[in-house]
């Protein structure tokens, strides 16, 4: 036995000897220690703040193999000065004042294994911060020279017995963590020691061996132990907050160099040092970076023989490895990480101890490495702080407030009363907010940030104590703002104690409704420690009865909580990066996720079902959005029955469910893709739902084959809205530049060739993805726009806009907003029904109903027997999300029906006058990152964006008569409002790079602040005369003695050193040094402005870094890189340098006391002009006389008389705006515009004018034009007639004609002969049209297109004369013109010509005759001609706007392009033998003398609550607006047109218009082709004189070739030549609201052949017959079996069992319960309760009388029928019983 022990001892001694080759027995090694940690904005200035450290380190090996150490003579020096050579600067000792560092000088021991330091043993009374500094020093000796912990890598090489050269990676423990470390070991030439003796000061002791260099580089990205604290980096992409690199704004690197002498078996560590550098872009936007550099250098001073054994430790404590140890807030004593881990996992205790014992006696390095790797996980797992308790402040490690006071929390300082300090800060902030300007000089927002930090240190009782004080002060009126400041700060704390207190405040009604909602929203956004206990308590709060009873609070609670759930439990990456997981462990726990699946989602599901059963639309919308916020795949189980028609909800709610699955697409793209693609694939689904599914599908990054299938299907899909969405999103995805979208971009590019060639407008379904990438800036902007226009309106019913940026690798959600509505028209209808005007018009119509003629709309509806097509009830939402703050506004028809009462209540409040005071402090963004530096000192980076919004004042408003009267909305005649208020907004972006020295509780800091302050006083009175269309706003100027800052912006870089416990703003601390650049490098400005023009004096002053950037630079970058290039050019000139800009109001130099703004608007239809002959362009003197009138109405009258002169049947519009400043002197400015335009008369005039009454200067831009109408139905006439347009323009300004500058111009626009020849000889549509014309069809699509093409004006000839222009302006214009020459070189030709005259410029513009894709521009001035040729116009929008047309003006062309209308407006044509619908569908038509409905306006309306369904006849008879157009064939080539309409403009009367062919075959402008009678009275008109009715509401006039055009304002116009008729829609009114030969005018051309019984036929003959008023009755009463109703949606399975994680179940008995139906007498009757139905064959049936609910055969009825046929089970339990029906019911199944 004893021999065995002896053998073991010998083996152990030999192992100890071989495992410590750097340390010789009985020898003491003395090293000098030098360390420094400095922080500064090194790329801005050489100013630094930091600390130097010096000491001696004594090391010697013990007999037991441990390395014993001791530190002596420790001292430190504080640095706050300029260092010309940066952090490396050498400072003489004479210039440094060192202080003794109270660092433990007691011995410590290092446990070695094969030369590696495994554990540190210190005296038990060692302080934690001391232990960490010791670790930082001894970490320099952590050298794995043999690759003991090497990571497997085929490229690695290891030392041999003879040579130490090697390259390999290890996982190494040092003070900064357990990180991957790259070793590069190689020999150095020995001669280097001669020139660099410091690298090996004891080189003489080298003995045998080499000079060896060891280079180590740490890879923090790959680490197993990351001592750190981080918060707010949830949106960081592909990175870890403690990694080597985070985005493009954070760099962390650590490099070590050691010099050894000797050989592998015995060597001496001569010197070693490590440089740890952290570089941060302070506010993520500047190009300059700040840094913290930490360096530790250990150099061998001497080697001494040791005469005695090292002394033993009196009270040893093994504190584990060298990794930084977290401190305890209440106790700064060092503690063992061993004990912590044993407590966490006691089962590993025995195995760990056995493993350590076994390791001491291993002999082979290779076998040791192998066995170590094969063993169980290491005992020293990453340390964690105990999970925060709800009632206690969390023990956040590394933060200055937690470790800054000698390693303890600053709360432990008896002189630091946290409650009192918080109260003091709140009071200071409150006092400063009262006087807004003080917030600048007092740095109020800095104080608020400090306040938030202190509140996070408070326990529950601390917060409760201060809250009671603040609340009582507010109640007693002592302090107005203290409560709101503290309330907001507690919400920002985001801790458990904050949550518990906020919960109590709500329960005790300290905060309620909107105030409570804002607090909850902030709390959820700022949560820092979402433990399971915290999340459950938050859920309890969100589901409390008291919360649920307050609608706003309930909504915010639910939405905020579900957002937080997603962040913590669903998005794993965000959860890891957002919260301090390296300090407290992961919050993404299994229990937490189970809680979401088993409690949260089921609760929301239950609430959704309850809301659906109660028809509570607002709650339904909120619950859908809340489920979408969570984004877990389990929400599919909730939505599945509604998607697939098993349960009944409105189609709008189904749409919203799809729209709210955005986060599901982000987190579970594979599952989401399957669901969205199935929804998209279902062509019987509603188009808007499919469009939203396409948008969500793109979010899920679809694979290339899926996009290709979708692209190919656009050539087949019948729903053009969906095709438009697919095409737009694929085409925009092809243009994405960001690398993040590379996969999507490639997939889209491969799918693009497969897309349909059809062009769609932006006003159709449109999904646009766009990004702007500025690589140098590290900035990307991503924009998503989605819109979907319904069939009833060009205005989108779905709109969505998202903007987020990737800033140096940080994704930041800036804005997400949008809205959805079930029906735009229903919204307008519901609002209109609330008005008194509606009641009056309805009454007026009721009185006229009895006078309707036989062809009235209602009578025709009776004969047609239309089947009513109802809409769903109105539903709508508007939502917005800024950062993490989400708000949803929901309304429906019932909400709007309460609008009059809501307005009445508000009117009552504002009539009495309302005081308002809103003060809100908020952190828009917060980030914090802390970890130990190489010196063992905690580094901290913080980024804060606090803002203050303050709005205070009083408002009083009065409407006469009241807007809400008798529960109806009325149009007031007068409105007056008085408001006196001040709006103040202050914001700060603040960034600190700091570190803490716990031994003297100092914090060293480099910072950068960017401040913005805006304060606007408002003292105004508004008086509006609605009836006269006049408004006046008076602004009173405050009489004050001191200057008032309105805008103030500063950028301030600085360095600082201060006490950790200081609670004053950094800028106000004594040792803060603002970094100011040299004055010569800055541009200073100081000027006054405004007094000359307004009598108000403003001063602007400040300074900024000199920038050298010119216009040419920006143009160059725009050409090369577009917007991103300009950004980069501007950004390159930005910096973190000190700058300032201020705008102030100077009352002492201002004479104005009141400013008055007046606006007058007037519009009228003028049959005959006051002056028959057109007046010439005004001279300046004539203009002056017309503007001399003081009264706006008089000025308007004079101007209208002028612009309307000589123009028949003109619509005159005029606006006059004046601005007066009254005081010691009166300043007055007048600006206005007027326009006169006629539909028939070619003359028109536009005028803009301005007058400065003080300087007696006036000016005007007047344009007179002559634009004749063109022919509309005959291509030959259009080609034979030369279309042309003339413009005459004059711009002038000055005192009088003698000194005023003047620019005159004339332009003539025409169609070139080349254009005409191209159309005739080369355009393929010309020959198609001519063939159709031979068949007497003149206006089918080909001819329509050609007729429009024939009138484009591709040639422009112009001349410009100018005089008395300012020479500087002339030089500028000449410079710009020369720039254009250079820009378009070599497509420029310059030649000399004979002079065109002085001050004259003339030339031509010729567009390419074929397709206008190129343009030639000729400019002649003086004696030179410049030709720009073949200038590209590939942009379709540009071509649309630039190439003029005499009929379709620019606005009309733009609208047509946006709507995808090839001919700019939708048209319907009844030609000789063929007709065309509004959807461009053509078919054969054969009319007879029987009147046939071409177009009848039959709007869809939702049923009004409480009313029974009415027939179409009843609805149209009561409708205040009706239109019907009938046509009959009276002869072989002759048709007659009958139009009946009523409108409020007709006073409810039905107006009958008849258009008959003229008996005279020779038609012309003076001899029109038709005879028109209105209500039996013949109309007289020609091409310049209009015949009108109802004050211009109906207008009739002739076109140049005699065609007759009839216009109905804001509805349609009709062109008729006796043989054919073309109806053109001019607004949204007719969309999806017509029946007749023109089709349905919906976005679905496949339903154009809908007959009055509301089914679709394929037989065009029967389609035409069904709309014959008399003959069609028999066919309408017995529709063909081939006539099929359009029923959408048809449901299908979109969620598979795997997607939804659920299985469908059936009844065990073989039966299922289903609703049934029967069809009788045009009704469909549904069973109110489901009946048993056999899955297999029926064995026995019984006959029963079953209660049923019957519905007329409407779309709704067929929808339910289709739903049941597909296996759905709609809920009829709440429907009334119509009758009973006998049915056979299954009693038993086989």
Curated annotation (Swiss-Prot):
UniProt feature, compositional bias: Acidic residues: 342-353
Chief place where the protein resides: secreted
Every VWFD domain range: 1466-1675
Glycan attachment residues as annotated in the record: 219, 297, 554, 573, 893, 1345, 1416, 1430, 1480, 1699, 1735
Compartments, record wording: Secreted
Pfam family, one: Vit_open_b-sht
GO MF, any single term: lipid transporter activity
General function of this protein: Precursor of the egg-yolk proteins that are sources of nutrients during embryonic development.
Protein name, as recorded: Vitellogenin
Protein's organism: Anthonomus grandis
């Amino acid at each position: 036995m004893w021999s065995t022990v002896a053998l073991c001892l010998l083996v152990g001694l030999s192992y100890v000897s071989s495992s410590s080759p750097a340390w010789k027995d009985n020898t003491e090694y003395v090293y000098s220690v030098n360390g420094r940690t400095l922080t500064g904005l090194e790329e801005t200035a050489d100013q630094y703040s930091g600390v130097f450290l010096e000491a001696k380190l004594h090391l010697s090996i013990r007999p037991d193999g441990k390395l014993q150490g001791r530190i002596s003579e420790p001292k430190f020096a504080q640095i706050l000065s300029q260092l010309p050579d940066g952090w490396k600067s050498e400072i003489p000792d004479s210039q440094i004042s060192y202080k003794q560092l109270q660092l433990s000088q007691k011995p410590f021991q290092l446990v070695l294994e094969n030369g590696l330091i495994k554990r540190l043993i210190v005296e038990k009374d060692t302080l934690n911060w001391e232990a960490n500094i010791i670790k930082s020093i001894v970490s320099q000796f952590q050298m794995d020279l043999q690759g003991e912990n090497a990571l497997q890598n085929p490229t690695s090489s290891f030392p041999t017995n003879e040579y130490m050269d090697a390259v390999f990676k290890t996982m190494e423990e040092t003070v900064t963590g357990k990180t991957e470390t790259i070793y590069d070991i190689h020999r150095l030439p020995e001669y280097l020691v001669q020139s660099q003796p410091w690298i090996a000061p004891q080189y003489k002791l080298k003995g045998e061996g080499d000079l060896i260099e060891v280079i180590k580089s740490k890879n923090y990205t790959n680490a197993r132990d990351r001592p750190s604290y981080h918060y707010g980096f949830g949106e960081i992409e592909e990175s870890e907050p403690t990694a080597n690199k985070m985005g493009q704004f954070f760099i962390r690197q650590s490099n070590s160099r050691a010099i050894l002498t000797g050989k592998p078996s015995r060597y001496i560590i001569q010197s070693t040092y490590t440089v740890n550098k952290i570089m941060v872009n302070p506010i993520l936007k500047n190009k300059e970076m700040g840094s913290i550099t930490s360096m530790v250098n250990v150099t061998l001073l001497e080697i001494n023989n040791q005469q005695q054994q090292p002394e033993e430790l009196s009270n040893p404590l093994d504190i584990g490895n060298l990794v930084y140890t977290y401190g305890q807030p209440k106790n700064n004593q060092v503690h063992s990480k061993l004990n912590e881990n044993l407590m966490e996992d006691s089962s590993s205790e025995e195995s760990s101890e056995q493993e350590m014992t076994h390791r001491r006696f291993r002999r082979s390095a290779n076998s040791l490495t192998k066995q170590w790797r094969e063993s169980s996980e290491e005992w020293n797992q990453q340390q964690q702080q105990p999970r925060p308790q709800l009632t206690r402040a969390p023990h956040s490690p590394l933060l200055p407030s937690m470790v800054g006071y000698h390693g303890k929390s600053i709360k432990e300082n008896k002189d630091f009363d946290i409650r009192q300090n918080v109260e003091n800060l709140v009071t200071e902030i409150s006092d400063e907010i009262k006087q807004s300007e003080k917030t600048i000089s007092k740095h109020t927002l800095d104080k608020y940030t400090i306040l938030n930090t202190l509140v996070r240190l408070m326990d529950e009782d601390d917060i409760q104590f201060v809250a009671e004080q603040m609340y009582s002060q507010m109640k007693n009126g002592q302090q107005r703002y203290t409560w709101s400041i503290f309330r907001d700060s507690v919400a920002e704390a985001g801790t458990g104690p904050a949550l518990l207190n906020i919960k109590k405040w709500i329960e005790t009604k300290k905060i309620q409704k909107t105030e409570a909602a804002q607090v909850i929203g902030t709390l959820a956004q700022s949560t820092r420690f979402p433990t399971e206990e915290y999340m459950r308590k938050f859920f309890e709060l969100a589901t409390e009865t008291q919360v649920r009873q307050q609608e706003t609070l309930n909504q915010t609670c639910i939405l905020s909580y579900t957002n937080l759930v997603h962040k913590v439990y669903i998005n794993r990456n965000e959860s890891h990066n957002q919260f301090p997981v390296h300090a407290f462990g992961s919050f993404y726990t299994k229990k937490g996720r189970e809680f979401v699946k088993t409690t949260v989602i089921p609760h929301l599901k239950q609430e959704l079902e309850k809301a659906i059963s109660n028809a509570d639309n607002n709650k339904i919308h909120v619950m859908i959005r809340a489920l979408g916020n969570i984004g877990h795949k389990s929400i599919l189980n909730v939505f599945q029955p509604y998607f697939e028609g098993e349960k009944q909800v409105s189609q709008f709610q189904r749409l919203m469910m799809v729209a709210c699955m955005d986060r599901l697409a982000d987190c579970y793209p594979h599952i989401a893709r399957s669901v969205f693609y199935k929804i998209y694939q279902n062509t019987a689904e509603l188009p808007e739902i499919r469009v939203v599914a396409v948008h969500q599908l793109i979010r899920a990054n679809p694979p290339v084959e899926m996009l290709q299938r979708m692209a190919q299907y656009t050539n087949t899909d019948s729903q053009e809205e969906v095709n438009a969405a697919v095409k737009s999103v694929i085409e925009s995805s092809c243009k994405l530049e960001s690398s993040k979208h590379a996969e999507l971009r490639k997939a889209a590019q491969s799918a693009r060739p497969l897309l349909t060639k059809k062009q769609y407008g932006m006003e159709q379904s449109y999904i646009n993805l766009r990004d702007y990438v500025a690589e140098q800036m590290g900035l990307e902007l991503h924009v998503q726009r989605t819109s979907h226009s319904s069939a009833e309106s060009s205005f989108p019913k779905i709109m969505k806009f998202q903007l987020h940026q990737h800033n140096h690798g940080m994704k930041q959600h800036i804005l997400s907003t949008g809205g959805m509505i079930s029906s735009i028209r229903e919204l307008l209808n519901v609002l209109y029904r609330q008005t008194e005007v509606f009641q009056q018009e309805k009454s007026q119509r009721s009185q006229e109903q009895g006078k309707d003629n036989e062809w009235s709309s209602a009578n025709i509806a009776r004969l047609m027997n239309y089947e009513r097509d109802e809409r769903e009830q109105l539903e709508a939402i508007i939502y917005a999300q800024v950062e993490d703050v989400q708000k949803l506004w929901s309304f429906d028809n019932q909400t709007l029906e309460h609008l009059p009462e809501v307005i009445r209540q508000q009117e009552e409040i504002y009539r009495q006058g309302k005081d308002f005071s809103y003060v809100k402090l908020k952190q828009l963004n917060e980030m914090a990152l802390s970890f130990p530096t190489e010196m063992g000192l905690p580094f901290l980076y913080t980024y804060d964006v606090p803002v203050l919004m303050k709005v205070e004042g009083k408002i009083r408003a009065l409407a006469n008569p009241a807007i809400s009267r008798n529960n109806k909305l009325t149009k007031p005649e007068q409105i007056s409002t008085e408001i006196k208020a001040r709006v103040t907004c202050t914001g700060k972006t603040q960034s600190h790079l700091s570190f803490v020295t716990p031994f003297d509780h100092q914090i060293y800091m480099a910072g950068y602040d960017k401040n913005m302050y805006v304060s606007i006083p408002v003292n105004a009175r508004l008086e509006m005369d609605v009836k006269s269309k006049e408004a006046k706003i008076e602004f009173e100027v405050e009489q004050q003695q001191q200057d008032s800052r309105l805008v103030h912006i500063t950028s301030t870089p600085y360095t600082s050193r201060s006490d950790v416990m200081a609670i004053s703003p950094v800028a106000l601390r004594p040792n803060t040094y603002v970094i100011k650049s040299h004055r010569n490098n800055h541009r200073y400005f100081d000027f006054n402005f405004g007094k000359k023009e307004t009598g108000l004096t403003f001063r602007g002053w400040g300074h900024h870094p000199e920038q050298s950037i010119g216009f040419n630079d920006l143009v160059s970058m725009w050409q090369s890189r577009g917007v991103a290039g300009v950004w980069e050019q501007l950004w390159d000139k930005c910096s973190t340098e000190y700058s300032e800009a201020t705008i102030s109001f100077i009352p002492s130099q201002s004479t104005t006391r009141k400013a008055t703004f007046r606006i007058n608007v007037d519009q009228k239809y003028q049959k005959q002009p006051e002056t028959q002959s057109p007046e010439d362009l005004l001279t300046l003197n004539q203009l002056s006389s017309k503007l001399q009138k003081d009264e706006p109405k008089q000025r308007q009258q004079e101007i209208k008389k002028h612009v309307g002169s000589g123009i028949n049947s003109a619509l005159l519009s005029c606006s006059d705006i004046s601005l007066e400043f009254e005081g010691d002197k009166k300043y007055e400015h007048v600006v206005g515009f007027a326009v006169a335009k006629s539909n028939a008369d070619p003359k028109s005039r536009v005028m803009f004018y301005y007058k400065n009454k003080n300087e007696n200067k006036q000016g005007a831009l007047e344009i007179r034009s002559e634009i004749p109408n063109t022919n509309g139905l005959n291509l030959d006439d259009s080609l034979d007639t030369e279309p042309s347009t003339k413009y005459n323009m004059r711009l002038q300004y000055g005192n009088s004609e003698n000194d005023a500058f003047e620019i005159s111009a004339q332009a003539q626009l025409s169609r070139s002969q080349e254009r005409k020849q191209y159309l005739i000889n080369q355009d393929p549509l010309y020959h198609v049209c001519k063939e159709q014309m031979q068949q007497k069809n003149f206006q089918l699509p080909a001819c329509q297109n050609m007729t429009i093409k024939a009138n484009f004006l591709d040639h422009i000839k112009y001349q410009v004369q100018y005089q008395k222009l300012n020479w500087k302006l002339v030089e500028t214009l000449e410079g710009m013109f020369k720039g254009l020459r250079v820009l378009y070189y070599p497509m420029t030709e310059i030649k000399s010509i004979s002079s065109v005259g002085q001050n004259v410029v003339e030339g031509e513009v010729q567009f390419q005759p074929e397709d206008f894709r190129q343009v030639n521009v000729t400019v002649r001035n003086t004696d030179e001609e410049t030709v720009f040729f073949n200038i590209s116009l590939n942009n379709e929008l540009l071509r649309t706007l630039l190439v003029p047309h005499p009929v379709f003006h620019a606005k009309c062309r733009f609208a047509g392009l946006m709507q995808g209308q090839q001919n700019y407006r939708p048209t319907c044509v009844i030609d000789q033998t063929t007709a065309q619908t509004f959807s461009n569908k053509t078919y054969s038509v054969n009319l007879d003398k029987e009147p046939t409905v071409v177009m009848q306006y039959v709007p869809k309306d939702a049923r009004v609550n409480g009313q029974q369904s009415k027939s179409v006849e009843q609805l149209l008879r009561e409708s205040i607006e009706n239109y019907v157009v009938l046509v009959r064939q009276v002869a072989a080539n002759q048709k007659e047109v009958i139009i009946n309409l009523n409108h409020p403009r007709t006073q409810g009367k039905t107006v009958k218009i008849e258009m008959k062919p003229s008996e005279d075959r020779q038609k012309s402008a003076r001899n029109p082709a038709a005879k028109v009678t209105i209500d039996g009275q013949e109309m007289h008109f020609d091409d310049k004189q209009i015949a009108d009715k109802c004050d211009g509401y109906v207008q009739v006039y002739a076109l140049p070739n005699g065609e007759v055009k009839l216009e109905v304002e804001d509805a349609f116009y009709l062109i008729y030549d006796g043989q054919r008729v073309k109806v053109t829609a001019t607004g949204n009114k007719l969309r999806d609201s017509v029946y007749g030969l023109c089709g349905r005018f919906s976005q679905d051309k496949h339903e154009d052949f809908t007959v009055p019984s509301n089914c679709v036929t394929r037989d065009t003959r029967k389609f035409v017959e069904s709309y014959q008023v008399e003959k069609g009755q028999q066919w309408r009463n017995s529709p063909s079996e081939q006539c099929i109703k359009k029923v959408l949606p048809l449901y299908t399975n979109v969620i598979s069992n795997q997607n939804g994680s659920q299985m469908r179940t059936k009844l065990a008995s073989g039966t299922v319960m289903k609703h049934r139906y029967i069809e009788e007498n045009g009704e469909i009757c549904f069973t109110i309760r489901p009946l048993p139905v056999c899955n297999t064959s029926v064995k026995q049936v019984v006959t029963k009388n079953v209660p049923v609910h019957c519905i007329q055969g409407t779309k709704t009825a067929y929808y339910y029928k289709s739903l049941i046929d597909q296996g759905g089970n709609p809920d009829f339990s709440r429907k009334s019983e119509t009758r009973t029906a006998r049915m056979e019911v299954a009693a038993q199944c086989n």
